[in-house]
C-alpha cells in the first residue's frame, strides 16, 4: 500500500536558501516593523514611500536568485515516488517549482513573487 502525503510549508523551509522570514529574530518585519504597512492595501495606496519601498524590496529580493534547499529537493523525491499528493505553501518564493515539483501538486496560498499584482489596479 502506497502512503499518500500532504505537506504544508512556510518560511522555515526557505530560510536555508537565504530568504529571510518575516517574524523571526532576523525577520523583515522584526528589523523593519514600520514596513508592515506595505501589506495593508489602503495604507499602501495612500503612501508613496511604502509603494516605493515595496517595489524596491521586490526588485532586490533574494527570492530571485535563491536556490532550492535540501527539504525542497526531498519533496520532489516524494512526488516522484507517487507519495506527495498536495504541497500547500505559504511561501511566495516559487522554490518548490524551481526544485521540480509539478504544478498539479503545488498550491501557492499567497501566490508567488513573479505573479503578484495590485488587487486594486491589477498591475
Where are these regions (language model features)?
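Conserved catalytic core of sirtuin-type NAD+-dependent deacylases
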Residues: 1-123
